Amino acid sequence: MAKKSMMIKAARSNKFKVRKYNRCPLCGRPRAYYRKFDMCRICLRKLALEGKLPGVIKSSW
């Protein structure tokens, strides 16, 4: 879990646009972020396995 101070710092508007970085809104993780789903890989996997993401299915071959 991310520190509250880091989540607040990321949410603030920066002086320069390039300094902005994405964080998962569910857990606050800054790495392994998927823009398409707006969350990190861990939360994405958890919600996909629960069936809460429409159109996402587990692949098997």
Curated annotation (Swiss-Prot):
GO terms for biological process: translation. The keyword Methyltransferase does not apply. InterPro entries: Ribosomal_uS14, Ribosomal_uS14_bact, Ribosomal_uS14_CS, Ribosomal_uS14_sf. Its cofactor is Zn(2+). SUPFAM superfamilies: Glucocorticoid receptor-like (DNA-binding domain) (SSF57716). Zn(2+) binds at C24, C27, C40, C43. GO terms for molecular function: rRNA binding; structural constituent of ribosome; zinc ion binding. It holds the Pfam family Ribosomal_S14. Keywords: Metal-binding, Ribonucleoprotein, Ribosomal protein, RNA-binding, rRNA-binding, Zinc. Binds 1 zinc ion per subunit. GO terms for cellular component: cytoplasm; small ribosomal subunit. Part of the 30S ribosomal subunit. Contacts proteins S3 and S10. Binds 16S rRNA, required for the assembly of 30S particles and may also be responsible for determining the conformation of the 16S rRNA at the A site. PANTHER family: 30S RIBOSOMAL PROTEIN S14 (PTHR19836), SMALL RIBOSOMAL SUBUNIT PROTEIN US14M (PTHR19836:SF19). Belongs to the universal ribosomal protein uS14 family. Zinc-binding uS14 subfamily. This is Small ribosomal subunit protein uS14. It comes from Syntrophotalea carbinolica (strain DSM 2380 / NBRC 103641 / GraBd1).
